Amino acid sequence: MLTSGKAPVDRRDFLKGAAAGAAAFVASPAISEAQQTTAPRGSPHTAADEGNIVEMKARIALATRMLANEGIVGSSGHVSMRIPGTDKILVGPADVSRDVITTDDVVTVDLNSKQLDGKRRQPDETEIHTGIYRARADVMSIVHTHPTYSVAFSVTKKPILPVHMHGAIFADGVPVFDSVGHVNTKELGDGLARALGNRRAVLLKMHGAAIVGGSLEEAFVAAIQLEENAQQQLLAETSGAGKVEPMTPEDVARCIKQSWRPASIQKRWQYYLDKNAVASKA
């Protein structure tokens, strides 16, 4: 049994759901049709019954702890999932350290950012999530991180370029939301969603990033890959070794086909599951 907080989750069911989730939204939103994989978009979930809600909360808590272990959420990043077939989302709370968050800490809010349940307080920046969910029906999960290397690009005029094969999914660009501070009003949430457009990630100037996916597993893996690519680019640009040459469109199409398949997403998700399990035992 895999446990998160007080709610047990069977490991086989958990991984089955993760694999199904990874199959969703595998094509980068603004990549051309020729560059996209053929896997379907959408959520693997069809019903929002109580059992599914508990499992979703457990997955949010686990993903948050894993992001904390990777050092990219800090003290106040958060993860959310849309409850399929409803106007509600589940999101991590404001008032719990990210490396100890449990199933019972996750709260429910509606798309107007009104908290509906939960013993904890919703994030001050719930509008990061609800703003994007209102604008993007294809998005089923959002990760808000505070990644060091990615945020560095939010204060320069240089864009994040695909310089790592895992960065190919961001070849259509990572825009910057040009507002400094918390995204804590409907107007700011809507503005962030407009800045994101149909892309996979957006930087919050001098602040963080919001990464979207058709499943929690996909949003999680994309968040990791955004920071990997940003680190690679900064290292290359500051090495003094010469001009940085990003991927060609042909490179992008090939790398997406090779490394953004459902099996590839699941492999990376499983790696972080195992890494988290080892860290938890240490």
For each of these PLM feature ranges, what is it?
Residues 1-10, 33:
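N-terminal secretory signal peptides
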Residues 16-29, 35-282:
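Glycine-rich flexible loops
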